UniProtKB/Swiss-Prot annotation:
<comment type="similarity">
    <text>Belongs to the UPF0260 family.</text>
</comment>
<dbReference type="InterPro" id="IPR008228">
    <property type="entry name" value="UCP006173"/>
</dbReference>
<dbReference type="InterPro" id="IPR005358">
    <property type="entry name" value="Puta_zinc/iron-chelating_dom"/>
</dbReference>
<protein>
    <recommendedName>
        <fullName>UPF0260 protein ECA2365</fullName>
    </recommendedName>
</protein>
<dbReference type="Pfam" id="PF03692">
    <property type="entry name" value="CxxCxxCC"/>
</dbReference>
Length: 148
């Protein structure tokens, strides 16, 4: 009998730092800028990617120094996870918190990010670089719940 994977055995707070980091599928959805309506506080997703995001790989160009380059970059932690209510339904942190299993395309399950890109979970197919955008409102994704 094989042992169940760590994400099925542990809560987020029980995970090691390495286990926590490995949960991230690298989809890049966290790296897309969001706009907030000041009147309604509704969050609008854009396809505008942080300049530090390598759109092809969906990985940060300067992960270790990201806060130096992008002071507004979010740091998702065990303590603040629930404050990010915009996390997509596909987010492993959210899934594990909700006691759900990881999808078959998740790199921890299938061993590669190829399936995630093929399933169009990553932002690779929609993202544009922040430095190339003039009017962010032209880049709002008018799909409620786009971030699955």
């Amino acid at each position: 009998m094989t042992e169940r994977p760590f994400w099925q055995q542990k809560t987020l707070s029980e995970m090691s730092d390495d286990e926590w980091e490995s949960l991230c599928d690298g989809c890049g959805q966290c790296c897309l800028h969001k706009l907030i309506d000041e009147d309604t506080e509704e969050i609008y997703f854009t396809n505008v990617a942080c300049n530090q995001l390598n759109i092809k790989s969906c990985q940060c160009r300067n992960y270790e120094k990201r806060f130096e380059y992008e002071p507004d970059c979010i740091k998702l932690t065990r303590e603040n996870l629930l404050t990010f209510n915009w996390l997509p339904a596909t987010c492993a942190y959210r899934l594990v918190h909700e006691r759900e299993d990881l999808p078959q395309w998740h790199p921890l399950v299938c061993g590669t990010k190829t399936e995630m890109h093929r399933e169009r979970i990553s932002v690779r197919h929609i993202a544009v670089r922040e430095s190339e955008v003039v009017d962010w409102q032209d880049h709002i994704l008018n799909k409620p719940g786009w971030a699955r």
